[in-house]
């Protein structure tokens, strides 16, 4: 099922986590807690990786124009309740780095949106368009923000979206939990 994660041109012949998920972890769980059942998680459980009806999902796949959720954008708060997952083992929302981190790697150069050093450290176009769209939709007009304001509002927006998605997962009567993936590191 792990092959569902990769487009055809880059599908690996083997996914190297297989031994950990199917041999090492089950033995470790059984040795330390013989009465606790072990169930491998995505991508090694179920008929296909990210199958929402069984096992866990990486909820990133539900962002975009997914047929079940009808998300239009990654930042559409009102669609989070429609994620059909029992457990999300990975999800998140793009966020900019903290200003102290940005200033550290800029090493005295000017903090500007078009600074190539800033872009090199993770401010790529798709990430920026998601952040900008979320700020525009939920907080203020992105175009009115300077670099400092962008970093501040990006963090606020990321926190709001994480909170909303965590609450949406928590409200499910059959929900078993979720794990947030931080996506604002270098």
Where are these regions (language model features)?
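Active-site neighborhood of glycoside hydrolase catalytic domains
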Residues: 1-54, 160
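Low-complexity repetitive segments in secreted/extracellular proteins
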Residues: 56-58
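Substrate-binding clefts and catalytic carboxylate motifs of secreted carbohydrate-active enzymes
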Residues: 27-30, 39-42, 46-52, 66-186
């Amino acid at each position: 099922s792990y092959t569902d994660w990769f487009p055809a041109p880059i599908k690996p012949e083997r996914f190297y986590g297989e031994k950990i998920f199917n041999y090492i972890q089950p033995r470790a769980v059984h040795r330390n807690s013989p009465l606790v059942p072990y169930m491998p998680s995505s991508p090694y459980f179920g008929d296909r990786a990210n199958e929402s009806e069984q096992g866990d999902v990486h909820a990133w796949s539900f962002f975009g124009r997914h047929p079940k959720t009808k998300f239009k954008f990654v930042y559409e708060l009102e669609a989070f309740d429609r994620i059909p997952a029992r457990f999300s083992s990975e999800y998140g929302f793009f966020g900019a780095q903290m200003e102290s981190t940005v200033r550290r790697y800029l090493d005295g150069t000017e903090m500007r949106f078009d600074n190539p050093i800033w872009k090199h450290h993770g401010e790529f176009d798709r990430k920026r368009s998601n952040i900008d769209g979320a700020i525009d939709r939920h907080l203020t007009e992105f175009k009115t923000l300077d670099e400092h304001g962008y970093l501040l509002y990006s963090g606020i927006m990321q926190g709001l979206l994480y909170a909303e998605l965590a609450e949406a997962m928590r409200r499910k009567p059959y929900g078993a939990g979720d794990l947030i993936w931080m996506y604002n590191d270098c």
